[in-house]
């Protein structure tokens, strides 16, 4: 680990001070998958441990960065289409289940800048996963988002 530059520290402080006020990554949606450990909604006796929340949204929904930052990586994930990682100082936001990704590693993104499109499966369900990390610690994204 290395010391943050003054700019990165300022960005991290800004990110942290916006807890509870971050915009949602999509304009319309509902949280259909909770963060953390909870019983599987269908399979009895199975515990799900989600490192993110799942937001169900409308078809062709544009997924936007919830804060300004730098795209750290764009990675194809088997079964989750493409994942985009955006760095905000020592905070990261992770967006997965994206298609038509508009950004690449090294790009600077602004607040609410489109980064891709939420994927729609064969059953017509459109969903994006949002994760928030502080260094290596996974955060529950729900309290970070504006209500």
PLM features per residue range, with description:
Residues 1-73, 78-81, 87, 129, ...:
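Extracytoplasmic/periplasmic cell wall- or extracellular glycan-interacting regions that localize
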Residues 74, 90-108, 112:
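Short histidine-centered loop motifs in beta-beta connectors
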Residues 84, 105-147:
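Conserved, short, structured surface segments that act as functional micro-motifs
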Residues 77, 98-99, 120, 144:
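Residue-level structural signal for beta-strand termini and adjacent loop
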Residues 54, 85, 94-97, 117:
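Conserved beta-strand positions that form and line the central face of beta-propeller blades
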């Amino acid at each position: 680990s290395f010391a943050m530059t003054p700019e990165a520290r300022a960005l991290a402080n800004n990110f942290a001070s916006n807890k509870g006020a971050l915009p949602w990554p999509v304009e319309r949606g509902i949280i259909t998958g909770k963060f953390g450990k909870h019983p599987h909604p269908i399979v009895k006796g199975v515990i799900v441990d989600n490192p993110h929340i799942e937001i169900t949204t409308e078809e062709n929904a544009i997924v936007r960065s919830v804060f300004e930052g730098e795209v750290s990586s764009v990675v194809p994930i088997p079964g989750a289409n493409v994942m985009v990682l955006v760095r905000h100082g020592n905070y990261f936001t992770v967006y997965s289940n994206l298609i038509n990704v508009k950004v690449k590693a090294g790009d600077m993104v602004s607040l609410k800048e489109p980064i891709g499109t939420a994927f729609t499966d064969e059953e017509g369900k459109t969903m994006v996963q949002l994760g928030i990390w502080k260094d290596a610690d996974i955060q529950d994204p729900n309290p970070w988002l504006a209500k």
